């Protein structure tokens, strides 16, 4: 469990940072060790670093209560949701002067007008990672390859080697791109059609994944996966046969991950000091060099070692980025509806059944078993009396 910390800035304090896995430079390969550098710069503040693998995992733990977290780094739509639900503290930007370095493009976003609750940490795109040893590049023309199909609807030979997101928002976004729907639709009929498309995909999917994608793709246990561009660059460093495709014609998710302070924080000033440190251009540049994501701070790029591939994948042209869509927070009832549909798809529960029908079936079985057991018990008692 995440522990608490003292609220006294002039005393030794510990801040609990809750972030994605493999999402901060740890000093490997000659890169900066961000946390070690921070603790050296601020000897009275120690960092307890804990990771999550999806926004939904993070939200569930935060909403459950009973923990203390000082800094979290959720994605754009989750920032909006947490703010709407009163789970974030307004930031005191007097303690975050380095926020001035954030590019204009990332200021005043729709998910957090005026950046009241967040400071951008990184940004990126979602595309298709594939292994050129096993996958014909001519087959990779759009999201349909994740259904083991080409653009003409013909079956391919990659069934069982395809991975899919294990979170509802990213999985539904891909289906929405295929069907031509908005990634932010709240129309239940459109969402049901997306779920049915994902249900059709299930037989060709090897696994639903998040962080497992690294080992599976690097070790060639899987050949095709949708994932984040920055993580592709990390994986391609381990397996040079991996390639990346961004389906611009169909659309893709353009996301921002941002630093926030939740209401369960016990030392806001120390938390803001940490956020400010991460916004220093030199620190941000060194950090992004290791995690391979795009920085929202252009001044940081002069401290980065960007090769041609990193530049083209992490910093597409503005015209191309305009084809991407950012997630917006959805109403709570829509989120529940989508989560329920996705749970049924990934667990192989037919969408033709009424929601909850599988529970009723099991309840009927339990009642029947109990009735049989009760009858047997009564019969046994009668025999004993005889």
Where would I find each of the regions flagged by the language model?
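Early extracytoplasmic/lumenal segment of secretory-pathway proteins
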Residues: 10-81
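Extracytoplasmic ligand-binding site segments that recognize negatively charged/polar headgroups
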Residues: 18-31, 68, 73-204, 209-218
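Paired acidic/hydrophobic, glycine-rich loop segments that form the ligand-binding mouth/hinge
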Residues: 70-73, 206-207, 223-228, 243-244
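A ligand-binding cleft/hinge motif common to bilobed small-molecule-binding domains
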Residues: 78-81, 224-241
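Periplasmic-binding protein-like
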Residues: 101, 124, 191-200, 239-263
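Conserved C-terminal helix/tail region of periplasmic/extracytoplasmic solute-binding proteins
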Residues: 215, 319-386
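Mature extracytoplasmic/periplasmic domains
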Residues: 262-326
